[in-house]
Amino acid sequence: MIELCLLGATGSIGSQVLDLIREKRDVYRLAAFSFGHNINKALDIIEEFEPDLVCAIEELDAKRIKETFPKVEVTFGNKGLQQVATHNCLCPKVINALVGSVGLTPTLSAIEVGRDVYLANKETLVIGGELVMAKAKENNVKIIPIDSEHSAIFQLLNGNDINEVKRIIITASGGSFRDKTRDELEHVTKEDALNHPNWNMGSKITIDSATMMNKGFELIEAHYLFDLPMEKISYIMHKESIIHSLVEFYDGSVFAQMATSDMRLPIKYALEYPSHSYTEMVEPLDLVKVGCLHFNELSLDRFPMLEYAIEAINKGNIYPTILNAANEVAVGLFLEDRIKFLDIEKIVKEALDNPIYEKFTTGELTIPKIMSVDELVRIQILTKYR
């Protein structure tokens, strides 16, 4: 029996992990999980899966759970996330499906106790990729990607020599506004942005997909996950989201990973790596039904957030933290109807260009530095826009 420690059980990825557990109850058990603010869904999960440990973000929610399920160990807050990541159980696998920079610390906690991490939390590598991969190597643990694009690359590289790779190509659906002009973006709404053409995802990542910051994050993730220089990482628009990534080798061969747009497939592959065992959860790919696949260039003029992400990783050090914190706050403000869609780009660019952060750009990158800058960026933006 494999016992899962699931960070972010009530979100989009977490819910799909639970689908996998339901399909294979003889293989997996949910030993511990965390959740954000969906207390009712968390209570349902406890009722169904009977975990040992539950972490709430809010103390009041933790108290309610303890009153309802007195035999369950309950914790809360950031320290609670670390407890979930290090929970003592049989054959543990830690799945990080959190959203935002809050995912970094529990990832490091899991690594430090020698646990492989199954990673859906993009921000872990965006802001702390250098530290995370170094710690993983030091502790001889694996970071297995759950993101569909990185899962595809992970599969395509398996059994191949990384030194023979000319480049990897990450595909992008283009998001909710891929067919709109810059002028048309002036008038789009939150509801428009949340209507993704291909994927069923959480609200934050759906907005990131619309701005193309999601793809920028994926470039940074790939840089760290596969230890490739940025010049070997490229991108292309592929509206159908059938090809999830490609790998081109120096002999001219190009390998592509294809599947339907269902996150349960990369989740399943990550947890069962390197197996491709049978499942009824995912609809088989029917290429005749798909008919045609289309590819287009991704313009940095049309999608400047992609350029900002490339700028941040090229500058290195604390700049990816600035990028991520500014984006998290800006997306939050947009979802609260406090700013317009194009203001997200404006806020991120202002943060990257703000000279107040220059004093943090020298010296070693550390967790305290990341956390300090993350907090400062958030304060600066919220002071101006709230």
What label would you give each PLM region?
Residues 1-386:
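Catalytic, metal-anchored helix/loop core of enzyme active sites in primary metabolism
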